[in-house]
């Protein structure tokens, strides 16, 4: 901080508190009275990794019913309190069984095409209707949280570090992925397998009889 301030910068310095935990993301449609929530996505990567660089799983794979109820309740209150008519993106953090709001964006996010495809809810079309005066309850999808389908869907980021050789591959708050793919399966493992294969990470190469290895990177305080 001393190094930053000694240069006499004029812009404010923002210091965030970091909490380890599980990040979640919600895209909702609000008309100012009712809210439609197609689904809740859970990130696999640690908290602090940019949402665009995280693997997002729908539906969440280890969130309790009580916590899901809190997420839905908070999402509805936030969307209605903002007074937004259209799309709202909300990012949460669960840490020590407490729910924290990371940020709320009254706009579309990169997860809208993903959640629209895997839930069958055309979010952009519906949000456009809401913005032009149609009520959420008249869209034909009900209100609140939509029922989860009998399958898992994962959004897997695609990186280009082999081409951007000078880029630091360590994932953090700055987005580094250059694309993303979708994997759908009857189980979470099947969806992850398909997603990772499509992203070029090739888990299929780990066939029986082949010599393989796993690289583990562990923080000093976790050793």
Range-by-range predicted roles:
Residues 1-209, 217-222:
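ATP-dependent carboxylate activation and anion-phosphoryl transfer catalytic cores
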């Amino acid at each position: 901080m001393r190094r930053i301030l000694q240069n006499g910068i004029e812009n404010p310095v923002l210091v965030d508190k970091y909490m380890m935990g599980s990040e979640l993301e919600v895209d909702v449609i609000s008309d100012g009275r009712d809210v439609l929530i197609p689904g809740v996505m859970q990130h696999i990567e640690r908290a602090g990794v940019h949402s665009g660089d995280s693997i997002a799983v729908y539906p969440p794979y280890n969130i309790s019913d009580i916590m899901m109820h809190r997420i839905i309740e908070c999402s509805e209150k936030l969307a209605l309190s903002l007074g937004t008519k259209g799309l709202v993106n909300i990012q949460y953090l669960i840490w020590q069984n407490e729910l924290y709001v990371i940020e709320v964006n009254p706009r579309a996010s990169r997860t809208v095409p993903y959640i629209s495809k895997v839930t069958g809810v055309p979010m952009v079309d519906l949000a456009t209707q809401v913005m032009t005066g149609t009520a959420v309850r008249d869209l034909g999808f009900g209100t609140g949280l939509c029922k989860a389908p009998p399958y898992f869907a994962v959004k897997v980021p695609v990186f280009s570090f082999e081409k951007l050789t000078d880029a630091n591959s360590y994932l953090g708050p700055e987005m580094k992925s250059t694309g993303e793919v979708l994997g759908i399966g009857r189980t979470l493992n099947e969806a992850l397998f398909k997603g990772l294969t499509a992203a070029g990470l090739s888990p299929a190469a780990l066939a029986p009889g082949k010599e393989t290895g796993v690289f583990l990177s562990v923080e000093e305080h976790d050793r």
